[in-house]
């Protein structure tokens, strides 16, 4: 396997993706570099589904090592300590946009491990690892609806700066990590926004910096789409340079399309009424009553399809709530 790499420029930062050099036994292995920060991300997925499993067993782990900073662990045993809060948050950051991006029905056990090889205290590794994880899954041939691109946007001196260094972040008022994918039109859809103000944001605003108004934040999100598109394009370029394994991945169907369609035709209006109830307890009780009613109507005692009925009903509720959020920009939960 030859070493291949792709470099893209996000703002004034270069991000390099490389594969074919480390962790060659892993189906998907990517080293992502920005400055002197290097992260190895490996992805592995079983080709079979564990019997009886009713969820997607995705594991994301971030391994920080003292050698990445050129240090030896302290303490008597000279061993690495427990996972830091930063590493835990990085795991969640990687998991959130990727988990819903897998093909519907994909239940094969999947593992993503990001190992921090080196840090330069200027370029954070979390967003880099997220992009590399998306690329690693593609190299492993794991079925995704769309690759994920992610970028950190920081409000510095009243301007949105992508992938700001830690030195630049000292002047930041507001920061966002934005992840997106490509829709059928080839346009970027935002799938995750994680945002927060800096520790001394109020002091900076009092000193004359712009506050992160709704319009300003919307501009930042809109600006991120260009960078997300470039990152996804860089991933696609590296994938095209490698032989991706073709695997017939098994997809699990929790319920038939006919069952869901019948339930939707018969009960969608009732679900819409129930989800509009503002009292949480009353809404929950009404939903449980309707679920029992649906189960009684469609149950097949010979096949024991109760679980499939409940999952189909749950899917209907989920879709109705989602449509309500999008159409009304409102949710009472």
Regions flagged by a language model, labelled:
Residues 2-18, 115, 120-124, 151-154, ...:
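Conserved mixed alpha/beta core segments that line enzyme active sites in large multi-domain catalysts
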Residues 14, 26-111, 116-123, 194-206, ...:
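Glycine-rich, flexible beta-strand/loop modules in the N-terminal catalytic cores of phosphate-handling
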Residues 54-61, 129-132, 310:
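Conserved glycine-bearing catalytic or ligand-binding loops at nucleotide- and phosphate-handling centers
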Residues 73, 77-79, 93, 111, ...:
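Small-residue-enriched alpha-helical segments and adjacent helix-cap loops
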